[in-house]
Curated annotation (Swiss-Prot):
It is an enzyme of class 2 (transferase). This is Xanthine phosphoribosyltransferase. Xanthine binds at residues 20, 27, 156. It is found in: Cytoplasm. GO terms for biological process: purine ribonucleoside salvage; xanthine metabolic process; XMP salvage. Converts the preformed base xanthine, a product of nucleic acid breakdown, to xanthosine 5'-monophosphate (XMP), so that it can be reused for RNA or DNA synthesis. Optimum pH is 6-9. HAMAP family: XPRTase. Pathway: Purine metabolism; XMP biosynthesis via salvage pathway; XMP from xanthine: step 1/1. Belongs to the purine/pyrimidine phosphoribosyltransferase family. Xpt subfamily. Induction: Repressed during growth on purines as a nitrogen source. GO terms for cellular component: cytoplasm.
Amino acid sequence: MEALKRKIEEEGVVLSDQVLKVDSFLNHQIDPLLMQRIGDEFASRFAKDGITKIVTIESSGIAPAVMTGLKLGVPVVFARKHKSLTLTDNLLTASVYSFTKQTESQIAVSGTHLSDQDHVLIIDDFLANGQAAHGLVSIVKQAGASIAGIGIVIEKSFQPGRDELVKLGYRVESLARIQSLEEGKVSFVQEVHS
């Protein structure tokens, strides 16, 4: 997605050869117009897949997931990383390690919001080692729901997350695929479209 790549080039900050900071438009301050375009793009890519729910993880996955849900006309469920007094019944849980925060979290979704009748699109802001995606896959499977695919806003293709998910048979659609963050510069994977 060219608009997203331009935004990354203009506003993204390479903190190391492993970490890209995009807090000016995605995971702290949010650019609503860009999120709308991201939602439109995911909706276009999954329009014929019979999606009934979108599942994401708080907090940075929520904006692109909501915009996609708006376009597809389906509800969005987000996994919580923190305990809540209201989230107690029929919990679907998974452990997720955050590459950026270097911490492990227990994520949870109320089972009342997912069922074996759902066909789910998983959306997240980043894909690095795939831990968040694997956690969300686990939660969706616990509900007995099926998975249409995984939509990623920014993929770090030099890390193993995508390959692992594809090997497991999941369709992964990433809007910006980063090949490298070496020498303080963002290099994108050159995609060949037929």
